[in-house]
Amino acid sequence: MTDNSKTRVVVGMSGGVDSSVTALLLKEQGYDVIGVFMKNWDDTDEFGVCTATEDYKDVAAVADQIDIPYYSVNFEKEYWDRVFEYFLAEYRAGRTPNPDVMCNKEIKFKAFLDYAMTLGADYVATGHYAQVVRDEDGIVHMLRGADNNKDQTYFLSQLSQEQLQKAMFPLGHLQKSEVREIAERAGLATAKKKDSTGICFIGEKNFKEFLSQYLPAQKGRMMTVDGRDMGEHNGLMYYTIGQRGGMGIGGQKGGDNAPWFVVGKDLSKNILYVGQGFHHESLMSTSLDASTIHFTRDMPEEFEMECTAKFRYRQPDSKVTVKVKGDKSEVIFAEPQRAITPGQAVVFYDGQECLGGGIIDQAYKDGKVCQYI
């Protein structure tokens, strides 16, 4: 039997059930476990209540229960500089960013990993639903989590081979229901705690109100693609491609009773384009350009491959051809895709393995630019 006692694993503990069970499983497997709570955002509300304080209490309770040392580290500055500034810049450019992808790349597996090394860590572990497998050459491959509904490789797609070499995902082979059962059997303080959802720094707050605190909204015209004026929009940053509703035009008909969707944006003219029907032709595209292309292991500077891809979280895979040149790529779809959204991640898969991905810049339909930005 392997003696894990000389292997130190520093666990990122959020105060939730997933990271609590992560620490418990590693402790049961004999590792030298240390828990660390990351404070990435000052989320004190108008009543002076800080949810991070409550979460840290839960971390402390679980750490005491399973008998591991624990610490708190403040990454508010790093988070602001590396994640939040990026988030604002993308919205300013009329795009729809995915801050979780950047948080994993820059905070959980960079700032936190660096901090863990100062504690003598051999590995860091998180409660992500993903799996890492080392091949005979020592290369780490990242595989989807066993729970299809919870698989989080989409959000981990920008991790490097160096980061994956130091990563452990003890929940990767489990179903979410099994994780809850383990927590309840062990009587963990977080066993019945509700899962957090949404963007961490927004929490339960109204998204529109939150964004308006940092970016001034500029109202403009809302038009159909054939030029019909549909009234005023509240600011392009509040709308995302493919969004249904929220435009205040539900009572207006355009020849049929189909619902209205956001089908495009023109940032230079501050126009929001809307159209009727889930499969409106302006929402469909046949290829995209992506940048910040990154793979989880070494790949040639220039190559072409066939694989599958996701263009948003929890979306079924789609067959694609990827043409890579440096950190940019063209992704050609086997079937037309709906609502490809600039700023979101495109993530590549070979069967169960997550190969990496990039950030969507522009969508095309039969070679013509989609009027998304």
Swiss-Prot record:
Catalytic activity: S-sulfanyl-L-cysteinyl-[protein] + uridine(34) in tRNA + AH2 + ATP = 2-thiouridine(34) in tRNA + L-cysteinyl-[protein] + A + AMP + diphosphate + H(+)
Stored Gene3D superfamilies: Adenine nucleotide alpha hydrolases-like domains (2.30.30.280), HUPs (3.40.50.620), Translation factors (2.40.30.10)
Record-annotated disulphide pairs: 103-200
Enzyme class: transferase
Database matches in Pfam families: tRNA_Me_trans (PF03054), tRNA_Me_trans_C (PF20258), tRNA_Me_trans_M (PF20259)
CDD domains (alphabetical): MnmA_TRMU-like
The keyword Iron belongs to this UniProt entry's keyword annotation: no
Residues the UniProt record annotates as site (Interaction with tRNA): 128, 344
GO BP: tRNA wobble position uridine thiolation
Residues reported to bind ATP: 12-19, 38, 127
Catalytic residue positions: 103, 200
Span list, region Interaction with tRNA: 150-152, 312-313
GO CC annotations on file: cytoplasm
Subcellular localization: Cytoplasm
Signal peptide per UniProt: none
Family membership: Belongs to the MnmA/TRMU family.
PANTHER family tied to this protein: MITOCHONDRIAL TRNA-SPECIFIC 2-THIOURIDYLASE 1 (PTHR11933:SF5), TRNA 5-METHYLAMINOMETHYL-2-THIOURIDYLATE -METHYLTRANSFERASE (PTHR11933)
HAMAP family: tRNA_thiouridyl_MnmA
Protein name in the entry: tRNA-specific 2-thiouridylase MnmA
Organism encoding this protein: Streptococcus thermophilus (strain ATCC BAA-491 / LMD-9)
Gene name of the encoded protein: mnmA
